[in-house]
Design a protein with these regions (language model features):
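Single conserved hydrophobic/aromatic residue that forms the stacking wall/gate
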Residues: 2-9, 13
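Conserved active-site-proximal phosphate/metal-binding subdomains
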Residues: 142-186, 192-334
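Hydrophobic faces of well-ordered beta-strands that scaffold small-molecule active sites
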Residues: 1, 15-19, 60-64, 86-88, ...
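Glycine-rich, proline-tolerant flexible connector loops at the mouths of alpha/beta enzymes
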Residues: 18-39, 142-152
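Glycine-rich beta-alpha junction loops
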Residues: 23-24, 64-68, 114, 139-141, ...
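Short loop/turn motifs at secondary-structure junctions
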Residues: 8, 56, 82, 130-131, ...
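Active-site beta->alpha loop and helix N-cap motifs at the rims of alpha/beta catalytic domains
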Residues: 35-94
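Alpha/beta enzyme core
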Residues: 68-183, 194-195, 199
Length: 334
């Protein structure tokens, strides 16, 4: 994910940018009590705006969490609004081909293991006669929700992610042959610069996906306080948490995390975000926590981040980050 909403995406310069649809309508004036309509309205608004800023070049995709109550509606609205691709994680999107008519937009899962990729590709093939247009393989150093167990993440050195990545590339071959097309694989999680991109692509991957560095850019529409939390973070400030979503995640170990680990925060209302959420049993409302943080109240909110956040020492630009990820530094973007 290059940036969360349309303003940053217009500056991704002829490459792929990804909009996250999770509670995307939070800045709409009527969001509270009207979350579903605001989210759908904002999906369209941000896709249209991103395409305008990109002048029709590159690809604008959306990331839709399978765990969302509005998962199916978000996917359908993104396609109607003209998204070039729909990428789904936080659960296996077994029904994604049903929601996206062939030829309308590309479809791609986010997976963290060969086993998950094999299951999904087999299901899509048998049930829908379709296959993935590309695959995002997310490793254990990514930010936000992670497709690994808490026990695995307690010692990521034991996770053989490169083996999983090469296994996924092997798994897709039979479907490439059957459907007569290439299925590119993009690796995500812990991608910092061109050396990481080279290492990943040397394994056979087609490219990388990066997110954390793009938060600390001038173009990102998060508050200055949120960006400064990234800039000021040290490696030791990062922690694996248990999210109200029910999955482990990587976030800054700030005052909010420490407080809610000692005692749950009262949940005053439901924002209808997660399918299986039980407000009386969760440590805090993830929607409220994320909104507080992105507005700048970072010590009272949830700040997701990747493992490399401690390397960020300033607020840069989208151009600088992309050039850092490119192989040839002497080749500048137009």
């Amino acid at each position: 994910r290059d940036s969360s909403t349309s303003r940053g995406l217009g500056d991704v310069y002829k490459r792929q940018g990804v909009i996250s649809t999770a509670q995307i309508g939070f800045e709409e004036p009527d969001f509270v009590g009207n979350e579903e309509a605001c989210n759908l309205r904002s999906i369209r608004k941000h896709i249209v705006r991103a395409k305008e800023l990109a002048s029709g070049k590159g690809m604008i995709a959306v990331n839709v969490m399978v765990a969302l109550q509005q998962y199916r509606e978000h996917v359908k609205e993104a396609v109607r609004a003209g998204a070039d691709a729909v990428i789904c994680g936080a659960g296996l999107p077994v029904d994604l081909p049903e929601l996206v008519e062939a030829g309308k937009a590309k479809i791609a899962p986010i997976v963290s293991s060969r086993r998950a990729a094999a299951l999904l590709l087999k299901t899509w093939d048998k049930k829908y006669g379709r296959t993935a247009d590309f695959i995002v393989t997310e490793g254990p150093e990514a930010g936000g929700h992670l497709g690994f167990s808490r026990e695995q993440l307690d010692d990521i050195s034991k996770i053989r992610f490169e083996e999983e990545l090469t296994g996924i590339m092997e798994e897709k071959k039979k479907y490439e042959e059957k459907y007569g097309k290439q299925i590119p694989v993009f690796a995500a999680g812990g991608i910092w610069d061109a050396s990481d991109a080279k290492r990943i692509e040397a394994l056979g991957a087609d490219g990388v996906q990066a997110a954390t560095r793009f938060v600390a850019t001038k173009e990102c529409d998060a508050s200055l306080g949120y960006k400064k939390a990234y800039v000021n973070a040290k490696e030791t400030d990062v922690k694996i948490i248990k999210s109200p979503v029910g999955m482990p995640g990587r976030a800054l170990n700030n005052a909010f995390i420490q407080k809610t680990e000692r005692a749950p925060e009262s949940v005053e209302r439901c924002y209808h975000c997660i399918k299986n959420c039980k407000p009386a049993q969760i440590p805090y409302c993830i929607t409220q926590a994320l909104i507080r943080a992105v507005h700048g109240d970072v010590e009272n909110g949830l700040v997701f981040c990747g493992s490399n956040v401690g390397k960020i020492d300033r607020i840069s630009t989208v151009r600088e980050v992309i050039e850092d990820l490119m192989y040839e530094k002497e080749v500048k973007m137009p």
